[in-house]
Swiss-Prot record:
UniProt cross-references to HAMAP family, sorted A to Z: UPF0735
Domain ACT stretches: 72-147
Superkingdom, taxonomy of origin: Bacteria
Protein name according to UniProt: UPF0735 ACT domain-containing protein Helmi_18680
Length: 150
C-alpha cells in the first residue's frame, strides 16, 4: 500500500522484531490509560525509551476492513428481575464492552433496551452474540440496529 510516498505493509506479528512488538504494546497501554507516562510503560515491557521513540509513530494497530467495532443493539426484555443482568453477563463473557445502555420504562410487561457495544475484543462474532442473547430466558428479541462507518 502506498500513501503519500510512504509504503505500508501488513505483517504477521510473529515475524516482527521484539522492539516493534514492545512498541505496539506501549502504544496500546498508553491509549488504554493503563499507564500515564512513556517511561512507566517502557519499563513494564522491557523496552528502552530510545527504541520506543524510534518506532512509536510507525507502529499502528490493524483493524479488519469492513468490520465495524462499534455496534448498536436493540433488545426487548420481559419485565422480570435479573433478565438485564443475564444479558450483561452474556456480553461480558464474550468479552464485549458495553459503552452506553438505555432501558425504557416497561409497558405491558416488556422493556425496550438499547446498548452500544465495542466488539473489538470479542471472542465470538456478532451473529453468535445475538443468537446467544435470543436464547436467554426473558429476551423476546435481539437485533443489530446499526454500526459505525468505517
Amino acid at each position: 500500500m502506498n500513501d503519500g510516498g510512504k509504503r505500508f505493509y501488513l505483517v504477521d506479528g510473529d515475524i516482527l522484531p521484539e522492539a516493534i512488538l514492545k512498541t505496539a504494546l506501549v502504544n496500546e497501554m498508553l491509549a488504554k490509560g493503563e499507564v500515564t507516562k512513556v517511561s512507566e510503560a517502557v519499563e513494564k515491557v522491557g523496552l528502552s525509551r530510545s527504541a520506543y521513540y524510534k518506532y512509536k509513530d510507525g507502529v499502528l494497530p490493524f483493524r479488519e476492513p469492513g468490520r465495524s467495532n462499534i455496534v448498536s443493539v436493540s433488545l426487548l426484555l420481559e419485565h422480570h428481575p435479573g433478565i438485564l443482568s443475564r444479558v450483561l453477563n452474556t456480553v461480558a463473557a464474550m468479552e464485549g464492552n458495553i459503552l452506553t445502555i438505555n432501558q425504557s420504562v416497561p409497558e405491558k410487561g416488556l422493556a425496550p433496551v438499547a446498548f452500544v457495544l465495542d466488539r473489538s475484543r470479542m471472542s465470538v462474532d456478532l451473529p453468535r452474540l445475538l443468537a446467544e442473547l435470543r436464547q436467554l430466558t426473558g429476551v423476546r428479541s435481539a437485533q443489530l440496529v446499526g454500526s459505525e462507518e468505517e
